[in-house]
Amino acid sequence: MNKPISSGLRTTFLVHFILGLIFGLLLLLIPESFLGMFGWNVAQPATYRLVGAAILGFTASSWFGYKAANWDQVRIVVLAELVWAPLATVVNLWGIIRADFPPIAWINVLIFGGFTVAFWILYNQHEAEAAAMSPAAKAPAPKVPARKAARRKRARH
């Protein structure tokens, strides 16, 4: 199944790469300054640096996905995004509602929520197209000659 990657998926990978690179580097290198601009209390900068490193890891996988040619090469990356992005969305929502996340966290909800929707739609689209291209989907059902079918039917009764 060497189904090419759609332009929509390639664009999603590129946007994810760019945003991830920006936010990941800022969190990794200057979490206090970056988050402090938005009123985010950074008591433990090492924790935010770790989040920045994780974001950069997913950013690298999006770059590899952007450069890949086939669905088979990026399927696992999209599945990982379908775990990461919804979890990040829920954690940010929880932080806004139950914890002390500042209002700027709504941007995180929108970004991660947007990636959740985009990767979900593109995953389903590519899986459906890959299934339609599979040899099993293309192969016609084997034909049984009419006489053999009649004999089989009589033998069962």
Q: What role is predicted for each listed range?
A:
Residues 114-134:
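Membrane-water interface at the C-terminal end of transmembrane alpha helices
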Residues 90-107, 124:
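Membrane-helix boundary connector in multi-pass membrane proteins
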Residues 18-26, 44-67, 79-90:
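Core segments of alpha-helical transmembrane spans in multipass integral membrane proteins
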Residues 1-6:
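Short, Lys/Arg-rich, polar N-terminal cytosolic tail immediately upstream
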Residues 130-151:
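Short, highly charged, low-complexity non-transmembrane loops/tails of multi-pass membrane proteins
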Residues 62-74, 96-97:
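Juxtamembrane helix-break-helix junctions at the cytosolic face
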Residues 8-12, 20-46:
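Membrane-helix boundary elements
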Residues 38-46, 75-77, 100-111:
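Non-cytosolic membrane-interface motifs at loop->transmembrane helix junctions
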